Amino acid sequence: MSVDAATVRKIASLARIAVTDGDVEAMVPELNNILGWIEQLGEVDTDGVAPLAAVIPNHQRLRDDVVTDGNIRDKVLANAPQAEHGFFAVPKVIE
């Protein structure tokens, strides 16, 4: 697959990117080089290679997922314009 100037203009139009004719002419060989590298990757023999999610092992250092009350009710209610009995107070909207 190769990219020509018309393809670059169409992609730029779809992406809503303004490009000059000089930019288009500079992008054509760059995009063709990138596509060439991608084609080379397609030729690599990966039989017997286990799929990886990351190159280095990732160990998630997360806390246990435990349900708590948050213990910050008073701090949250301090930001409310009006609170009653530990809850947000809002105007009555049902008639």
From Swiss-Prot:
<protein>
    <recommendedName>
        <fullName>Aspartyl/glutamyl-tRNA(Asn/Gln) amidotransferase subunit C</fullName>
        <ecNumber>6.3.5.-</ecNumber>
    </recommendedName>
</protein>
<dbReference type="GO" id="GO:0005524">
    <property type="term" value="F:ATP binding"/>
</dbReference>
<dbReference type="GO" id="GO:0050567">
    <property type="term" value="F:glutaminyl-tRNA synthase (glutamine-hydrolyzing) activity"/>
</dbReference>
<keyword id="KW-0436">Ligase</keyword>
<keyword id="KW-0067">ATP-binding</keyword>
<comment type="similarity">
    <text>Belongs to the GatC family.</text>
</comment>
<keyword id="KW-0547">Nucleotide-binding</keyword>
<dbReference type="Pfam" id="PF02686">
    <property type="entry name" value="GatC"/>
</dbReference>
<dbReference type="InterPro" id="IPR003837">
    <property type="entry name" value="GatC"/>
</dbReference>
<keyword id="KW-0648">Protein biosynthesis</keyword>
<comment type="subunit">
    <text>Heterotrimer of A, B and C subunits.</text>
</comment>
<comment type="function">
    <text>Allows the formation of correctly charged Asn-tRNA(Asn) or Gln-tRNA(Gln) through the transamidation of misacylated Asp-tRNA(Asn) or Glu-tRNA(Gln) in organisms which lack either or both of asparaginyl-tRNA or glutaminyl-tRNA synthetases. The reaction takes place in the presence of glutamine and ATP through an activated phospho-Asp-tRNA(Asn) or phospho-Glu-tRNA(Gln).</text>
</comment>
<dbReference type="GO" id="GO:0006412">
    <property type="term" value="P:translation"/>
</dbReference>
<dbReference type="InterPro" id="IPR036113">
    <property type="entry name" value="Asp/Glu-ADT_sf_sub_c"/>
</dbReference>
<dbReference type="GO" id="GO:0070681">
    <property type="term" value="P:glutaminyl-tRNAGln biosynthesis via transamidation"/>
</dbReference>
<dbReference type="GO" id="GO:0050566">
    <property type="term" value="F:asparaginyl-tRNA synthase (glutamine-hydrolyzing) activity"/>
</dbReference>
<dbReference type="GO" id="GO:0006450">
    <property type="term" value="P:regulation of translational fidelity"/>
</dbReference>
